[in-house]
Amino acid sequence: MTTLTEGPHPGGFLVWEVLRDYTRETITVASGAGKLAPGTVLGKITTGGKYTGLAPAATNGSQNAAGILWAAIDATDADAASVVILRGPAIVNRSEIILPEGATEAQINAAITALAALGIILR
Protein backbone atom coordinates (compact mmCIF):
# COMPACT_ATOMS: atom_id res chain seq x y z
CA MET A 1 0.00 0.00 0.00
CA THR A 2 1.28 3.46 -0.89
CA THR A 3 1.73 5.91 1.97
CA LEU A 4 0.95 9.52 1.17
CA THR A 5 2.45 12.43 3.07
CA GLU A 6 0.52 15.65 3.17
CA GLY A 7 2.53 18.86 3.37
CA PRO A 8 1.51 22.14 4.93
CA HIS A 9 -1.57 23.89 3.56
CA PRO A 10 -1.79 27.62 2.78
CA GLY A 11 -2.57 29.35 6.06
CA GLY A 12 -2.85 26.02 7.87
CA PHE A 13 -0.79 27.42 10.73
CA LEU A 14 -3.32 30.17 11.49
CA VAL A 15 -5.50 29.70 14.58
CA TRP A 16 -7.12 33.14 14.64
CA GLU A 17 -6.72 36.62 13.17
CA VAL A 18 -8.64 39.80 13.84
CA LEU A 19 -9.35 40.67 10.19
CA ARG A 20 -7.57 39.23 7.17
CA ASP A 21 -7.56 42.52 5.30
CA TYR A 22 -5.65 44.03 8.22
CA THR A 23 -3.22 41.25 9.16
CA ARG A 24 -2.19 40.14 5.65
CA GLU A 25 -0.28 41.97 2.92
CA THR A 26 1.09 41.03 -0.48
CA ILE A 27 4.88 41.34 -0.48
CA THR A 28 7.81 40.43 -2.74
CA VAL A 29 10.08 37.52 -1.84
CA ALA A 30 13.58 38.11 -3.19
CA SER A 31 15.02 36.00 -5.97
CA GLY A 32 17.33 33.36 -4.56
CA ALA A 33 15.17 32.66 -1.52
CA GLY A 34 14.34 29.25 -3.01
CA LYS A 35 11.20 27.21 -2.46
CA LEU A 36 9.43 28.23 0.73
CA ALA A 37 6.53 26.44 2.40
CA PRO A 38 3.47 27.93 4.10
CA GLY A 39 4.35 28.93 7.66
CA THR A 40 7.94 29.92 6.88
CA VAL A 41 9.09 32.79 9.08
CA LEU A 42 10.42 35.61 6.91
CA GLY A 43 12.90 38.42 7.41
CA LYS A 44 12.80 41.74 5.55
CA ILE A 45 15.90 42.81 3.67
CA THR A 46 16.62 46.41 4.64
CA THR A 47 17.83 47.52 1.21
CA GLY A 48 14.99 47.18 -1.28
CA GLY A 49 12.36 46.02 1.21
CA LYS A 50 12.00 42.50 -0.19
CA TYR A 51 11.57 39.45 2.03
CA THR A 52 13.44 36.16 2.36
CA GLY A 53 13.51 33.25 4.76
CA LEU A 54 14.60 34.24 8.26
CA ALA A 55 18.41 34.16 8.40
CA PRO A 56 19.59 34.64 12.01
CA ALA A 57 23.27 35.02 11.00
CA ALA A 58 22.58 37.68 8.35
CA THR A 59 23.29 41.39 8.70
CA ASN A 60 21.00 42.68 5.92
CA GLY A 61 17.80 42.88 8.00
CA SER A 62 16.66 39.31 7.27
CA GLN A 63 17.95 38.28 10.69
CA ASN A 64 14.82 39.84 12.22
CA ALA A 65 11.48 38.02 11.96
CA ALA A 66 9.08 40.21 10.00
CA GLY A 67 6.15 37.96 9.06
CA ILE A 68 4.92 34.47 8.19
CA LEU A 69 4.47 33.21 4.63
CA TRP A 70 0.86 32.28 3.81
CA ALA A 71 1.33 29.88 0.87
CA ALA A 72 4.12 27.97 -0.87
CA ILE A 73 6.21 29.94 -3.35
CA ASP A 74 9.24 29.41 -5.54
CA ALA A 75 11.63 32.36 -5.55
CA THR A 76 14.61 30.35 -6.73
CA ASP A 77 15.25 32.19 -10.00
CA ALA A 78 13.02 35.27 -9.80
CA ASP A 79 11.25 37.49 -7.30
CA ALA A 80 7.85 36.12 -6.27
CA ALA A 81 4.78 37.91 -4.95
CA SER A 82 3.09 36.28 -1.99
CA VAL A 83 0.71 36.92 0.86
CA VAL A 84 2.19 37.16 4.35
CA ILE A 85 0.83 37.67 7.83
CA LEU A 86 2.63 40.90 8.74
CA ARG A 87 0.77 42.06 11.82
CA GLY A 88 -1.69 40.96 14.43
CA PRO A 89 -3.65 40.50 16.43
CA ALA A 90 -3.18 36.95 15.21
CA ILE A 91 -2.56 33.59 16.84
CA VAL A 92 -0.62 30.88 15.01
CA ASN A 93 0.15 27.25 15.80
CA ARG A 94 3.80 27.14 16.89
CA SER A 95 4.21 23.54 15.75
CA GLU A 96 3.34 24.53 12.17
CA ILE A 97 5.76 27.46 11.89
CA ILE A 98 8.96 26.85 9.92
CA LEU A 99 12.13 28.33 11.36
CA PRO A 100 15.62 27.96 9.85
CA GLU A 101 17.30 24.61 10.33
CA GLY A 102 20.09 24.88 12.85
CA ALA A 103 18.65 27.95 14.58
CA THR A 104 19.71 28.12 18.22
CA GLU A 105 17.25 28.40 21.08
CA ALA A 106 18.24 32.06 21.50
CA GLN A 107 17.61 32.74 17.79
CA ILE A 108 14.24 31.01 17.94
CA ASN A 109 13.27 33.00 21.03
CA ALA A 110 14.36 36.22 19.29
CA ALA A 111 12.11 35.36 16.31
CA ILE A 112 9.16 34.56 18.60
CA THR A 113 9.70 37.84 20.45
CA ALA A 114 9.90 39.82 17.18
CA LEU A 115 6.67 38.23 15.92
CA ALA A 116 4.97 38.97 19.26
CA ALA A 117 6.01 42.63 18.87
CA LEU A 118 4.09 42.58 15.57
CA GLY A 119 1.05 41.14 17.36
CA ILE A 120 1.59 37.61 16.00
CA ILE A 121 1.41 35.22 18.94
CA LEU A 122 2.66 31.62 18.75
CA ARG A 123 0.74 29.06 20.82
Q: What is the predicted function of each stretch?
A:
Residues 1-123:
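Surface-exposed, low-hydrophobicity beta-strand/loop segments enriched in small/polar/acidic residues
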